[in-house]
Amino acid sequence: EGSYAVVAVKDSGEMAAFKESSPLALGISDGELFLASDVTPFLEHTDKAVFLEDGDVVRIEDGNYTIKNDGEDIDREVNHIDWDAEEASKEGHDHFMQKEIKEQPDTVKRAVFQDKSDVEKAIKMIEEADTVYLSGCGTSSYAADLGAKYLREAGYDVISEQSHEMEYWNNHVTEDDLVIAISQSGETADLLSMLEDVDAPVLSIVNVVGSTLARKADHTMYINAGPEIGVASTKAFTAQIAVLKLIGETAETSLKEARNSLINTAGKIEETLEDNEEMVEEVSDYLQGQEHVYFIGRGKGFEVAKESSLKLKELSYIHSESFPGGEFKH
């Protein structure tokens, strides 16, 4: 019962590990094996990983490993992680979040270079659904809210809801619907729990290759943002939005037009970051010591307001709220 990932080590170096409802990855290199909650800690040593399933017990001895589940030998797939180890370092920046903010022009471009077949399959799943439900937690829930607006503009019946709330009424989701599940890590517990009782097909938008969500989904689109070390999500958020916008725009026009439009957006992100460094310092100085900060937005700007408010709370512990522009006067 419960959620756990446990590693036991003997003096001889022999190890055993098992998991239930918590992520555990086995990194595989020549003569070396690694255990971690995700792949980032061992990226500098190997780009090969096995993602353990619930009930798996892995035993490591003399540079070899075996996996059992319910007493039976299991042969789990070895995944290739297409991340550069340098991406998991600060590369001269003061902190990871600064680095990841500045990576956004590149990560948005990577996010929109999806295989045509993957985009077409996602659109087909959406078109065949009676209702499309977008769901995530925290930052990913705001990406879901914004993505829902993009898909509504393309003419689809779409509802967005935070996963921990959707779990209370997911019995209304039928096999004729579609759930688009959004998560940077692919290990968000509330999201995975909600999906357990859903009969509808699942399209996942996720960053971490081989994660639990990616394995359980009927179809997955990776945002290709690389490792996000900063606790407060930045580049994963914009990459999630880029993929959702790519789907919606492709449905209305073509993949080529949608991709070119978003590549142009990536260029504008780069200009915005370069042109506003001094203003960022000025606003930061002004916010220091403030007790309350309110973010106001209309339309798609409301999702930006919600995410901005969350970022301020996460990083500064300053009280912050967000409101739609029309609601603020009430």
Feature-to-residue mapping (PLM):
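Beta-sheet entry/capping signal
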Residues: 5, 14-15, 32, 57, ...
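Active-site phosphate/pyrophosphate-binding segments
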Residues: 104-108, 112-133, 219-330
